[in-house]
Amino acid sequence: MPPNLQRIFPALCLLGVLFLLHCTPVLCGCDNPPVVAHGHHTQIIGLFGMKKDEVVYKCDEGYTLVGEDRLSCRSSRWSPAAPQCKALCPKPQIDRGKLSVDQDEYIESENVIVQCGSGYGLVGPKIITCTEDGTWHPRVPKCEWEYPEDCEQVHEGKKLMQCLPNLEEIKLALELYKLSLETKLLELQIDKEKKAKAKYSI
């Protein structure tokens, strides 16, 4: 007997003649719907509470469905191919960093290239991948300010603006420099007064 006839079919015996009745795909025997990792399926209910030969897939929280969400039992097979539930990774938060693909969430196996803004250097991997557990691998890198060698002893002028990474730090440096000048001036005045007193006391 052919493999497709080795199933139990509904039949009708009429006047001594056996008739095989047409059966729906579900009765003819689709196996259980495919199991999807990190997801689940529900069977569609039709009119009068009858179960239809269709199932709908949904993913667990933190996962997104890739593929068709609805499968039908046709010719004893589920069609189309079962979907996948892939993990979602949050957007990497990298101060002074830029991402090759800028979006709120990333799908499992998606790669992102990290670049740092002007004056900042990358500490860590340049390429990171969204993994199946919803985390990034390797570890998310950092962007740190690169301190030029010729900036070590800079205290004032145009060079100061070139060496400091942003306007806020330039303002702070200038305020500190101004304070240091005022302190030196005060020290000179005190020293001058001391010398004057010493001169008159002789």
Swiss-Prot record:
A Gene Ontology biological process term: lipid transport
A UniProt-annotated Pfam family: Sushi
A cellular component annotation (GO) from this entry: extracellular region
Keywords recorded for this protein, A-Z: Disulfide bond, Lipid transport, Repeat, Secreted, Signal, Sushi, Transport
Tissue specificity statement from the Swiss-Prot or TrEMBL entry: Plasma. Found on very low-density lipoprotein (VLDL), on chylomicrons, and in the D > 1.21 g/ml fraction of pig plasma. Found in liver, spleen, lung, bone marrow and lymph node.
Ranges where the Sushi domain occurs: 29-87, 88-145
Listed CDD domains: CCP
Cysteine disulfide links: 30-73, 59-85, 89-130, 116-143
Signal peptide positions (record): 1-28
Subcellular location, record wording: Secreted
Domain of life: Eukaryota
Stored InterPro entries: C4bp_oligo, SEZ6_CSMD_C4BPB_Regulators, Sushi/SCR/CCP_sf, Sushi_SCR_CCP_dom
Chief location: secreted
Record has Repeat as a keyword: yes
Oligomeric and partner information: Forms high molecular weight disulfide-linked complexes.
Protein task: May be a lipoprotein-borne regulator of either the coagulation or the complement cascades.
Name of this chain's protein: Apolipoprotein R
UniProt source species: Sus scrofa (Pig)
Source species taxonomy: Eukaryota, Metazoa, Chordata, Craniata, Vertebrata
